[in-house]
Amino acid sequence: GASFSLHVLSKINSYKSQSTKPIRGVASMAKKSVGDLTSADLKGKKVFVRADLNVPLDDSQNITDDTRIRAAIPTIKHLINNGAKVILSSHLGRPKGVTPKFSLAPLVPRLSELLGLQVVKADDCIGPDVEKLVAELPEGGVLLLENVRFYKEEEKNDPEFAKKLASLADLYVNDAFGTAHRAHASTEGVTKFLKPSVAGFLLQKELDYLVGAVSNPKRPFAAIVGGSKVSSKIGVIESLLEKCDILLLGGGMIFTFYKAQGMSVGSSLVEEDKLDLATSLLAKAKEKGVSLLLPTDVVIADKFAADADSKIVPASGIPDGWMGLDIGPDSIKTFSEALDTTQTVIWNGPMGVFEFEKFAAGTEAIAKKLEEISKKGATTIIGGGDSVAAVEKVGVAEAMSHISTGGGASLELLEGKQLPGVLALNEADPVPV
């Protein structure tokens, strides 16, 4: 309503006087990047690149979505264009020991096609045969090592195993954001033996947006948090409450907040053990002067199914036996108006059960609104998980400033945690003042 708009406008005016710094200005997170390395640093050097090539494969070993492979290409291209010898490492799936269906062999044709050269494939990731292939690599060549998780030592971050991996190369590039929150041999252990250890372009972009833009946003800064459970998003909400001006909540978690406020929620999803927490988060938002918006109306259903009967009711009027599965049209309008005032938005988690067409309107409306404000110059960040699927489904992914490729890694960064795979990298050179 009007009071909300006035509240936001008064905040906006108070920010106009503040200076804006460039995104990379977050000193604590500035890492040396592969872009800082020139041909003088790279020509003839063996570079161990840990990428995240964990792509989905069908039963015939065909790649069903090559997004992660495409995302790894800029870093590899920069290295080969500067005469490096690239030793590429990744995991795929969660193999228990050597498991042929988790081999990286099916990735070779697509990698070769995207790089415009024949990628050589090793049948192992350490040992004499691999060492021989490394010795034969020409400048600008690429060797793909076998799935690093075929060794249980990888996830144990075994120092002997890390040393064997590191012995293949002269320097290290981590471009695997999706596993940066894990201290494994190929993400953290190898950095103890290889200097410099630097961030790849993909990892760098994730840090620039999820840490840089969130720590030092163009304001007003809004966070949209959805998803079915408060429990999985507590850390994110608590961390973002410290930084954002507007917090919009949607998805199944809202019913825990409603119940905490004494409203009846019918048979909607509620986490009974999180009611006190919901109350304290509402109080914290008030104390911090954050405009926390909960949906004022919801789309309810008589069962959890695509063909359920549905109707729109005020949030305070959910009858027994009905469950809320999406935010309603009034909420979409209020949320959209709030987003129109913003300069930076981060979105993590859908507004409703968008897999069912009947309950997808809220999520789709948010995606379209983000496309609209993005085109007007706002910074829009999709913080991993189901929100990524949502913007892709609506066809607005191209318009977003940044779409995070991480699941757990994105959440941990948004929770304000340090990631082991990032901490292990060399600091950026001090910028001359």
From Swiss-Prot:
Q: Which residues bind Mg(2+)?
A: 386
Which species is the source of this protein? Spinacia oleracea
The residues that hold ADP are 227, 251, 354
Q: What pathway does the UniProt record associate with this protein?
A: Carbohydrate biosynthesis; Calvin cycle
Question: Which keywords does UniProt give here?
Answer: ATP-binding, Calvin cycle, Chloroplast, Kinase, Magnesium, Metal-binding, Nucleotide-binding, Plastid, Transferase, Transit peptide
The record's top EC class is: transferase
Q: What is this protein called?
A: Phosphoglycerate kinase, chloroplastic
What chemistry does it catalyse, as a reaction equation?
(2R)-3-phosphoglycerate + ATP = (2R)-3-phospho-glyceroyl phosphate + ADP
Q: How does it assemble?
A: Monomer.
A cellular component annotation (GO) from this entry: chloroplast
Kindly list the positions annotated as binding ATP: 233, 252, 324, 355, 386-387
Protein family: Belongs to the phosphoglycerate kinase family.
| Compartments where located | Plastid, Chloroplast
Claim: Metal-binding is one of the keywords in the record:
yes
